[in-house]
Amino acid sequence: MPRVSIVEKSQLFLKAIVEGVPPSLVNSLRRVIISELPVMAIDTVVVVNNTSVMYDEFLAQRLGLIPLTTPLHSLPTYEECATGVADPTECGTRLVLQVTADGDVTVYSGDLTSERPDVVPVYKDIPIVKLVKGQSIVIEAYAKLGIAKDHAKWQAATASYYYYPKVIIKDEKCREICKEICPDLEDPVKCTFNKAWTCKDLCKGGLDVEWEKNKYVFWVESFGNYGVDVALKEAFRILKRKFEAFTEELVKKASSGER
């Protein structure tokens, strides 16, 4: 029976112990979180005026990598946007960056103004470019819903896991030898699998490291486009859709006798 116990949680971070599921399923969830969660990101940039020292292309790249808040509950799904089922105007928004310098000025992500109040830069203090007196930039930027499988600017979160280590201490001296690497050798959250193996090498036979089958320490960190709760719900929705599509195709092939 699958079980999950939360070790640490905040709005943008979650660490949990997962057990009772095969590694293939845990890895599938990890891959979906990294590459298939939909988020808004600037995809097209129209440079109306740029007298700064930075090339238009560099500005466009920086704008594309600024994370934007993404209200999934009020947006069409990525599938609807990608297939043209949804109204294209609902799958994106327009942002404007217009700054004229009266002196030495740093232009920040917070200077971007959006036509949608719910799609704005997550962090207002990301520097874009420096201007001196008399320089100006006027840019129209168009954001749209996308996934990191197409480009890294659409990555919403990162995720990873490691096998739940089982440390067997044969010589109590190992605790002293390893106290800087792993102060608590028997705590799998504080002493990761790799750290435990480092301790094993240092102890030279005084410690064994095994792992528990189908038990892992799993963590997710959101980049701020939405919270980790939303990220996980969306990841499971995507996984469920994939499983349903696979099952449907499998039944279809079996019914028709195809190989």
Swiss-Prot record:
It is an enzyme of class 2 (transferase). InterPro entries: DNA-dir_RNA_pol_30-40kDasu_CS, DNA-dir_RNA_pol_insert, DNA-dir_RNA_pol_RpoA/D/Rpb3, RBP11-like, RNAP_Rpo3/Rpb3/RPAC1, RNApol_insert_sf, Rpo3/RPB3_RNA_Pol_subunit. Transmembrane segments: none annotated. One of its GO terms (molecular function) is protein dimerization activity. It comes from the Archaea. It is found in: Cytoplasm. GO terms for cellular component: cytoplasm; DNA-directed RNA polymerase complex. It catalyses: RNA(n) + a ribonucleoside 5'-triphosphate = RNA(n+1) + diphosphate. One of its GO terms (biological process) is DNA-templated transcription. Its EC number is 2.7.7.6. Keywords: Cytoplasm, DNA-directed RNA polymerase, Nucleotidyltransferase, Transcription, Transferase. Belongs to the archaeal Rpo3/eukaryotic RPB3 RNA polymerase subunit family. PANTHER family: DNA-DIRECTED RNA POLYMERASE (PTHR11800), DNA-DIRECTED RNA POLYMERASE II SUBUNIT RPB3 (PTHR11800:SF2). DNA-dependent RNA polymerase (RNAP) catalyzes the transcription of DNA into RNA using the four ribonucleoside triphosphates as substrates. Part of the RNA polymerase complex. This is DNA-directed RNA polymerase subunit Rpo3. The lineage of its organism: Archaea, Thermoproteota, Thermoprotei, Thermoproteales, Thermoproteaceae.
